[in-house]
Structure formats: C-alpha cells, structure tokens
A protein has these predicted regions:
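Generic structural signal for residues in well-ordered beta-strands
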Residues: 61, 144-148, 217
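Active-site/ligand-binding-proximal alpha/beta "capping" segment
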Residues: 163-201, 206, 215-218
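Short, hinge-like loop/turn segments at secondary-structure boundaries
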Residues: 121-125, 185, 236-237
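N-terminal positively charged helical leader segments and presequences
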Residues: 1-68
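Mobile, glycine- and charge-enriched loop segments
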Residues: 38, 62, 71-80, 183-188
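Residue-level signal for inorganic ion chemistry
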Residues: 35, 96, 132, 210, ...
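Structured adenosyl-cofactor binding patch, chiefly the S-adenosyl-L-methionine
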Residues: 203-244
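RNA substrate-binding interface of SAM-dependent RNA methyltransferases
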Residues: 70-168
C-alpha cells in the first residue's frame, strides 16, 4: 500500500487532504483511481483511507481507520554527520531514515574534504530532504526526518547541547564496555545526539571540544567503520535497546 504524509491540519474528522507534489504522483505516476486505498500519516496518527476525489491540486481521501503511529523510536535521535565525499550522504540519509533517525545535520568538520559553496548548498539540502521523504515512505515512518542546512562544528555542538545524551564514536576510545552502558542508559523520551566524523575521522581537538560539551566518546568495536557505516551501526544498536 502506498504511504503519504500530511500535516495535522490536513486531517478532518472523516477525511484527509493531500496537497503538493504527492497529488501529481498519485494521479499521473501511480495512476490511482477513486476507491483505491492509501496509508496517510500526520506524525502521530496513521490513517487507512480510500481515495474519494482527485482534483487538480488536491486529493481527498475518506478515513476508514485511525491508529496511533507505532513505527517511531521512543527517543528522538539526531545524527550529526561530518560531510562525506561523493554521494555517500545520500546513502547515509536513506539508511538512517530507515533505522529511525529523526533529524540529520550535515556538519563541516576539519577533516572534511568536501566544501559546499553557497549556491549548491540549498539545492543539495532539497535533494537530501526528498531522499528522506522517499525513505520515510518506504519504511512506513510516522514522520519525515528533517535534513538541516550545513552547520559548522561549533554550531552543531551548540545545537546538541540540550540533548540528554551526546555520543561520539571514535576509533581511539577506550573501554569496550562503554557502548553497552551508555546505550542502555538511554530512556524513552530522552534525546540523543550522535556525532560521526568524515572519512578522515575526528581531530583530537574536536573530540576534546565535544567532551567539554558533555559528550561521551565511545568505541564501536575493534574494527574501524566507514563514515557511511558508523551512524547506521549506532542507530541499529539504539533501536535494539529502545525497542527491546
């Protein structure tokens, strides 16, 4: 069944209104007809609907069943990703959305090779947001994770400062028991910030700055993970702990 997102104000007592690019997708790409069923989510409720009317700029669907969204992790997770090379960011966004991340913040770190210019930055962000939406639909998410504009490392640490847990996977972190202890300490309703370095990793100064903000450097094991793998690994472990 096809999955679509709306804002809460687009849901009435007995019907929902779908607007924007999804209208064209429903009508001209999927070629759906009146009476066909779709799944619609407003971030907290999931609606089983049947298409009632197809207009030029709006699709109206009759609500047949309402249930609480159950696909979201009970803790809000924000991934701060050091800007990687090539198209790796697209893979990171797609897979981390599937694994339950709520926000992704691209971060310019000292060892980042890629430098986004101002003209390309917004176009990139829009593409990344579209990838997030597509992955959220595929995964049956209850919301579309936000892809933030590029931040400096200082800005990222400031944004993360109010989170209950700030985790920094680091290949030189000691105490192999730490990840289990730290992840098990995360409780439903708490917010978690995860910082992932770019291909070259973190500089020691960046780790020190993060620790000064309350972050805990953790190891992900005896093997060094690629930047596009590390965030997924932490999310998978967090998901296991939170949904156990």
């Amino acid at each position: 069944m096809y999955h679509f997102f709306i804002k809460p104000e687009q849901a009435a007592a007995h019907e929902v209104a779908i607007i924007g690019s999804d209208v064209n997708h429903i009508k001209n790409v999927l070629r759906m007809k009146v009476g066909e069923q779709i799944c619609v989510n407003d971030g907290s409720h999931e609606y089983l609907c049947s298409i009632a009317q197809l207009d030029a700029e709006e699709v109206t669907a009759k609500i047949e069943q309402v249930s609480e969204t159950t696909s979201e992790l009970p803790s809000r997770i924000v991934l701060f990703q050091g800007l990687p090379k090539a198209d790796k960011m697209e893979t990171i966004i797609q897979k981390c959305v599937e694994l339950g991340v709520h926000e992704i913040v691209p971060v310019q770190m000292k060892r980042c090779v890629v430098k986004l210019d101002c003209k390309k930055e917004e176009a990139k962000r829009k593409r990344w947001q579209a990838i997030s939406e597509s992955a959220a639909k595929q995964a049956g998410r209850g919301l579309i994770p936000d892809i933030h504009p590029l931040m400096t490392y200082k800005e990222a640490l400031l944004y993360a400062s109010d989170k209950e847990h700030i985790l920094v996977p680091f290949e030189h972190a000691e105490n192999m028991q730490a990840p289990r202890d730290v992840l098990s300490a995360v409780k439903p309703g708490e917010q978690v910030a995860i910082f992932i370095g770019p291909e070259g990793g973190f500089e020691d100064e960046e780790i020190a700055q993060a620790e000064n903000c309350g972050a805990q450097a953790i190891t992900l094991g005896r093997r060094i993970l690629r930047t596009e793998t590390a965030g997924m690994a932490v999310l998978a472990m967090l998901g296991y702990v939170l949904e156990e």
